[in-house]
Each structure stands twice: as C-alpha cells, then as structure tokens.
C-alpha cells in the first residue's frame, strides 16, 4: 500500500504569474532560468521551448541591459509560458520590460538601489498588475547588512527581505513573493523557516549556486526537501550548472518523491545484483529515455529478481519481476503475462504506453461526467 503525503502546506496569499497561480492552494510550481545570451533571441526562444517541454511552469530570463530588454520583448511575443525578468542594478530595465509584457519582475534588494527607485518599479507593477519577487541572495546582501553581520547569516537574509517587504507594505503593494537563497543548505533552510513565520506571501525556494548536475541535485534535493516537508514553499527553482532542462527534471522528481505533484512515470527500480535475470540498468535507461513524453502519472516497478520483485510489482500500475526463463509482468497489482528476455524493453514500452493511455482516457471520462 502506498502512503499518502503527510505534508500540510503553509498558508500563503496567492498571486498570478501570467496565467499560473503561485501560492494559496495552487500546486507548487517549477521554474528554471535560461542561460543563453538574452540578446540572442533565436537561441533564447529555443531554450525556453525546451524548458517548457520538460514541464516547467515558469521561466526566468536575465535582463542585464536595455538591449537585452528589447530582446526580451521580442522573446515574449514568441513564447507562451509565463516569463520572469531577472533585474539587477538598473531599475529602468524593470520599467522597460514591464511595458514589453513581462509576467513577473525579480528585483535584488542588494543592488536595486534607493527606495525612490523601488517605488518607481512598484508603481509600474501596480499599473500593469505585474507581481514582483523580492529575491534576496547571500552573495549580494546590502553593504550595511554585510557590515552589521560580518558575513551572510540566516538573520541577515531575513532582515534584507523584511526591509523590502516593509517598503512594499508602505505603498500598499501586496502582489509579490519572496526568496532568501544561499548556497549553504543550512543557512538557506534556516532563513526560509524564519521568514515563513513572519510573512504571508508566497515563498520561492532555491539553493542558489548549488553546483553541477550531481552535487547540485543532491544539495537542492536535501535543502528543498527539508523545507517542502515542513510545508514551506510555493514555487521552486533547482539551480544547476547544467542544461536548464535538467533543473526542471530534478524539480519534478523532488515534488514527485514527496507526493506534492504528479507527472509522468514514477520508476521504482532495484540497483541490480548477481541475482538479476535481465540487465536492470540498461532496461531502466532505455525506458526512461523512451517514455519521457508520457505525462500521465503512472507507477512502474522494474525489479531484477523474485526476492522483492513480486512484492513491489503488486503495488504499482505496471510491475516487472525478473524470472527464469521468462519475466513476470503485473498490471494493477495482478499477474498479467510473461515477457521473454528478447525484446523485453519493446514489450514493456508498449504495455506502459497502453496503460498510460487507458488511465488518461478514464480520467478524461470522469472529468467529462462531473
């Protein structure tokens, strides 16, 4: 029997980033960020489309100059996914992309400048109903906070965030979310936990500059997992020095592992040993690659022998338990058929696609009857 998620999410206000709800009772959204030159419109559009295909809900784009702002306007016209403009130093860039159709403005309290500049951004955002993200980062805290604390700390991150929350409150602007990111897992977790008790706005989670594909995945999974288990977090971004598509995949895997969202196939597979009756690792790699396009939630077990195979296979939609001379396949917990070693992956792929299509059709039929 599969356990239900025990997580009770923190109550937060809901904002809209384009047509995507963030906070409140909305699903936790997944973001990524382009790493192309924004002025290269073709490359940036192509990457955004790949990120969207991978399952992202929102994409952030760095806008470091006015030339990039104009390019952002061209990009905005060519993609359908909500776009966040990442703004540093020059508040005038925020004003320009607001006019060009941005769905959310990320500003950094550590470098956006005086309150007068923030007010200009707030006024523009209010006029056009654009949400703002107050994006605090341990690597770019305000100079006075660096002096006060000596080094980045959870308290410093939270103080920076609250300072700018107070500014937005003063001007009666509530259409915003907040992040307090650090590359240190414990610092980020402590900061988010403290901030979560002091504001009601949505929280954007991330472990900043987490590292490469393997190390960054581990750090992000540990840090974000701790917070999400606490019920903290309304949108997440996994920061990896890797293809942004990988960020989306990891983000989905984190949410799926905590049963906070479902999409595509949840594979359960043994690490393989000398008892395996087929090549588990090769089979898994093939199936993951071939079935990436399936979005219907489905649990699939691939177990190499009869020790744990039947037990795992009974708990999933499609289960494979290795055997000799044939491998036993379960469908919806019931033994269904046996597959030869030859063409094992082809046979499994065909069966999984059939089950996914049937499940999708049933869900559509239920919705149609409601």
UniProtKB/Swiss-Prot annotation:
Pfam families: GcpE. The gene is ispG. Binds 1 [4Fe-4S] cluster. GO terms for molecular function: 4 iron, 4 sulfur cluster binding; 4-hydroxy-3-methylbut-2-en-1-yl diphosphate synthase activity (ferredoxin); 4-hydroxy-3-methylbut-2-enyl-diphosphate synthase activity (flavodoxin); iron ion binding. The lineage of its organism: Bacteria, Pseudomonadati, Pseudomonadota, Gammaproteobacteria, Cellvibrionales. Its cofactor is [4Fe-4S] cluster. Disulfide bonds: none annotated. Its EC number is 1.17.7.3. This is 4-hydroxy-3-methylbut-2-en-1-yl diphosphate synthase (flavodoxin).
């Amino acid at each position: 029997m599969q356990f239900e998620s025990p997580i009770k999410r923190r109550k937060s206000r809901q904002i809209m980033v384009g047509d995507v709800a963030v906070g409140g009772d909305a699903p936790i959204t997944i973001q990524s960020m382009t790493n192309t030159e924004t002025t290269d419109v073709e490359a940036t559009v192509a990457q955004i489309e790949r990120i969207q295909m991978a399952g992202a809900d929102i994409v952030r784009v760095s806008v470091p100059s006015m030339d990039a702002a104009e390019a952002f306007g061209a990009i905005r016209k060519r993609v359908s996914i909500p776009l966040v403009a990442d703004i540093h130093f020059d508040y005038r860039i925020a004003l320009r992309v607001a006019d060009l159709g941005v769905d959310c403005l990320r500003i950094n309290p550590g470098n956006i400048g005086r309150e007068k500049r923030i007010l200009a951004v707030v006024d523009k955002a209010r006029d056009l109903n654009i949400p703002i993200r107050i994006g605090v980062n341990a690597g770019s805290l305000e100079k006075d906070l660096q002096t006060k604390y000596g080094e980045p700390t959870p308290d410093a991150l939270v103080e920076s965030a609250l300072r700018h929350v107070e500014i937005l409150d003063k001007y009666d602007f509530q259409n915003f979310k907040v992040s307090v990111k650090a590359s240190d897992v414990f610092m980020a977790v402590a900061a988010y936990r403290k901030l979560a008790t002091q504001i009601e706005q949505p929280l954007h989670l991330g472990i900043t500059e987490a590292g490469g594909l393997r190390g960054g995945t581990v750090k992000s999974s540990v840090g974000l997992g701790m917070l999400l288990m606490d019920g903290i977090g309304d949108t997440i971004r996994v920061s990896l020095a890797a293809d942004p598509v990988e960020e989306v995949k990891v983000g989905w895997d984190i949410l799926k592992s905590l049963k906070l969202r479902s999409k595509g196939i949840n594979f359960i597979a043994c690490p393989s040993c000398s008892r395996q009756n087929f090549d588990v690792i090769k089979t898994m790699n093939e199936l993951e690659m071939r079935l990436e396009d399936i979005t219907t939630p489905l649990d699939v077990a691939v177990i190499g022998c009869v020790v744990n195979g039947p037990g795992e296979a009974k708990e999933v939609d499609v289960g494979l338990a290795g055997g000799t001379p044939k491998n036993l396949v379960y469908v919806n917990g019931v033994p269904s058929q046996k597959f030869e070693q030859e063409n094992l992956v082809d046979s499994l792929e065909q069966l999984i696609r059939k089950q996914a299509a049937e499940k999708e059709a049933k869900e559509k039929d239920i919705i149609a009857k409601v």
